[in-house]
Amino acid sequence: MRADPSAHQAGKVARAVVGVLVAVAFAVAGCTSPAANPAKPAHQAAHDRSRPNFVFVLTDDLAWNLVSHMPHLLAMQRAGTTMSRYYVVDSLCCPSRSAIFTGQYPHDDGVFTNAGNDGGYFAFNRHGDQQKSFALALHEAGYRTAMMGKYLNQYQPAYPEPPGWDEWDVAGNAYGEFNYNLNQDGRQQHYGKDPRDYLTDVLAAKASAFIDSSAASGRPFMLEVATFAPHAPYTPAPRYANAAQQLAYPKTPAYDRLPANPPPWLARHPYLSAVDQANITTTFRKRVEDDLSVDDMIGELENELRAKGLDRNTYFVFSSDNGFHMGEYTLSSGKQTAFETDIRVPLIVSGPGVPAGRVVSQLTSSIDLAPTFETLAGLPVPASVDGHSLAGLWHGQDPVGWRLAILIEHHGPDYSPDDPDRQTSKPGDPPTYEAVRTPTALYVRYAGGAQEYYDTATDPYELDNLAGKGVPEVLRQALNALETCRGGASCWAAAQLG
């Protein structure tokens, strides 16, 4: 069984990249890199008109410690490739989802939070990000496109459908999985309390129907199914109620421990009480139960693809918008930090030319998905996109001069009263920060001047903050360059630690 690949083993491969000359790296980084022009898999060679399909399942708050409880996803992992060092641009729903759609960092697409002037659906619109979405690019290139489930924070079913989607089945605050409205191609439909109304199951049925109609149309398709699970309040499908009540929470060495020399916001946190720890166990069990219906959906969609003869020409991509801590660093249940628990999430892919059972350890980011979809669809990637296509990595290539740093940007805490990501951790959540992650280090710089620096090669659980002893200048320079980069060439050069 494989779930979360070992960070230590991944680090050995990633560190080997550091010795590559920066000049070679920059030459490869242009839009003509191997990743940008993958060789066509052999079984497609006889079908020059055939373009690949995409099924993209995006979960909400799913952390690596849930993957081992999802048998269909584990089977997909064995049949496909796992990106073991895939990071989100921010451990928060809307900034992460915006980056996935646009391929841009928050400082470039303008979405830093879930609401307010610098976040949410309205900021996404105000910054013209709907026009940057990979969905619009694929739609204009002849793809059938469908968006199902959760779109962006603040979006409600009464709002108009954004451009670029042929089918639109999107809810608003449907975190409870029952009693919600769906905007179904511009018409609102209410779903109630019946077991058949369970949202993840409704999405699974609609997604299967979309695959069926796409097969009949003969057109390539992009299907995104964005579940609300396993976000709180953790409502499992009735068939899975109490299915995980014997599980214990998988504690790591960081559980209920403060790092040495913690930043001020974290140093104020009390250690976990007995009640806190009991709640963490209960929450973990509910999250597992919540995800079992997501896993069922994965199996159903794979079966539908096989039944229609589309499985060999469809990339099936699974991921999460952010990770989730539960007791680590004395924090109860939540996200938003730059710790590994929150920013590193699953990215698992199967499909044409994707090697089975492979683990890719290069640093990858949520800004890379949009250019990957566009590249695999045969489209040019706009120069304004900050990310880089993963097509070469997905096809088993090992590109020379891959990036050596990625950026994480977080604004907060600044909650709207109805923000579903409002956390209960006391006395507070992390303030605004920017961070850089490399194969062997994490450097965090807070707006108030505090810093964190962890040598993750020797301290993988990030328990010894070395910032007081000095931060390597190469990390400071990388963060300075990444936080101001704009566009593919600029952001790729900034990521070379040179």
Kindly label every feature range from the protein language model.
Residues 50-55, 79-84, 95, 108, ...:
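Loop/turn elements at helix/coil->beta-strand transitions in domains of secreted/extracellular proteins
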Residues 54-55, 60, 138, 150, ...:
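A short aromatic-rich beta-strand->coil structural motif
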Residues 26-47:
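C-terminal region of N-terminal signal peptides and the immediate post-cleavage residues
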